[in-house]
Amino acid sequence: MKSVQFCFLFCCWRAICCRSCELTNITITVEKEECGFCISINTTWCAGYCYTRDLVYRDPARPNIQKTCTYKELVYETVKVPGCAHHADSLYTYPVATECQCGKCDGDSTDCTVRGLGPSYCSFSESRE
């Protein structure tokens, strides 16, 4: 019986501690209207588990804790989009996370929706690597 309890506790610890909010490599699709196509860029962003609590009922003494894995520090990098017309602005600036934290999602700078467009969304029919 103790081995079953140990296994359960170990799995819980692993799920919480080892899948915590951390930097991860992702590929995003970026587009420039002036260029008429999308390109894929590798960048770093935050992903993982954050403790959250959503009560079934409202209790002013115990507010809901809704934390998400989000950036603590950002830098911006710029890439030249190849193949744009000569008169078009071919530079694209995108965020790169350098440090992560579990915190409140800032809707002013982050897509906090349950189902956003996703990192591979492209509004043009043509996509280039």
Curated annotation (Swiss-Prot):
Disulfide bonds join C21-C69, C35-C84, C38-C122, C46-C100, C50-C102, C105-C112. SUPFAM superfamilies: Cystine-knot cytokines. Residues 1-20 form the signal peptide. It is found in: Secreted. SMART domains: GHB (SM00068). Its main location: secreted. The keyword Glycoprotein applies. Gene3D superfamilies: Cystine-knot cytokines (2.10.90.10). Glycans are attached at N25, N42. One of its GO terms (biological process) is follicle-stimulating hormone signaling pathway. GO terms for cellular component: cytoplasm; extracellular space; follicle-stimulating hormone complex. Pfam families: Cys_knot. GO terms for molecular function: follicle-stimulating hormone activity. Keywords: Disulfide bond, Glycoprotein, Hormone, Secreted, Signal. Coiled coil: none annotated. Heterodimer. The active follitropin is a heterodimer composed of an alpha chain/CGA shared with other hormones and a unique beta chain/FSHB shown here. Belongs to the glycoprotein hormones subunit beta family. Together with the alpha chain CGA constitutes follitropin, the follicle-stimulating hormone, and provides its biological specificity to the hormone heterodimer. Binds FSHR, a G protein-coupled receptor, on target cells to activate downstream signaling pathways. Follitropin is involved in follicle development and spermatogenesis in reproductive organs. This is Follitropin subunit beta. The lineage of its organism: Eukaryota, Metazoa, Chordata, Craniata, Vertebrata. The gene is FSHB.
